[in-house]
Amino acid sequence: MNNKFQNIDEITSADVQKESLFKKTVFSIFFIWTYQYIHINYLCEVWSYMRYFKNELDFSQVFLTYIVALFPIYFYSGLKQISSYFSIIIYIMCYVPIVVTLSYNNTDELGYNTVLLHQVVLAFSMSFFFLVDKIKTIKSKRLILNIPIFWFHVFTILTTLYLVYKFSGNMRFVGFEDIYDLRSENSQFSDPISQYLTMWATYLIYPIYFSLGLVKRQKMYLLIGILGHIMIYMISGAKASILMPVIIFLIYIVVTKIKYLSFSQSLAFFVSSLSLLLFKVDVDSLFLFRSIFLMRTLSMPGYLFSNYLSFFSNHPYTQYSHIGIVNSFTNSYPYGDIPIGVVIGDYDMTNANANANFWATDGV
């Protein structure tokens, strides 16, 4: 096996050729409509007690919501660099849910002009993510081509050992009804380093191993990815950690089987189709998976951003003092010893640690 990561241009040149203005528009609108439909007909009906609202919007407000949600995709030009994978996933799994949720959750409370202003700022931010892929310097390319996978293995081993060292006394399997107890118990063992490493392990390290296992047909990589996600679940009770290998596998099947679609089109089609299928097939056996995927995974970025925006509309801003290193210099964190995620969790009455995406925690 090649001991270095391959040049991303050699792998994804065909993907760029599959991108077109028409396909971008059609698949993006399909996904935006799907999420709007799920928000109105599932989230607001089943989970309304968790601050999922259905504000009445007129045609112009709905139209502008679609325009803002659609705008950044025209700056996406296919898989050109490794960052392209992350940017399109952020667009589908984070950006669109945030834009749609803000319109339906916050318009009555904050006024549509305030909501639209935040949506426009997010649109430019997402567009910039896509534009970054076009910035390609000789220095950055050499860096990509000369990072041996050996050092990635070393980083993985050190991360795993540190997490096991920190939480080995309380790592265990729990049912979904007990995950908040597990999180509460393990919060006393956590520190800023373990919190960051847990996020990296959940959304980067072990997904990369599982993905490499699929692409290279390496059983060892698949095993590392699966065991890593199981370990994270035993530490944090994160449902996303258990669901991640399943989602990656399904995306892999869709991308490899639908040859005439690009990665972005396949991902939008897959997420939309799975969402509609889970909603329409109303059987009790799917209730858990439906809630995990539609509510806990797909809607959570928008839900949390909406709650952060609502909370900070009438509470003091942290001015980045929620970041431990910053607060060690400024000592200005306004909520005492309570982490910002817990503060928001108390506000939205879930009594959970509402850690959110960077747009919410560092943007709002």
Task: List the model feature ranges, each with a label.
Residues 8-22, 38-56, 177-196, 275-364:
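Small-residue-enriched transmembrane helix-hairpin modules in multi-pass membrane proteins
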Residues 27, 83, 87, 225, ...:
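Alpha-helical protein-protein interaction elements
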Residues 236-298:
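Loop-centered beta-sheet repeat module
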Residues 199-248:
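Long, hydrophobic/aromatic-enriched structural stretches that serve as scaffold segments
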Residues 1-210, 214-219, 256-263, 268-280:
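Membrane-anchoring hydrophobic segments
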Residues 125, 223, 244-248, 255-256, ...:
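Generic detector of ordered, mature protein regions
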Residues 102-115, 227-252, 363-364:
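Helix-loop-helix junctions and helix-breaking kinks within/between transmembrane helices
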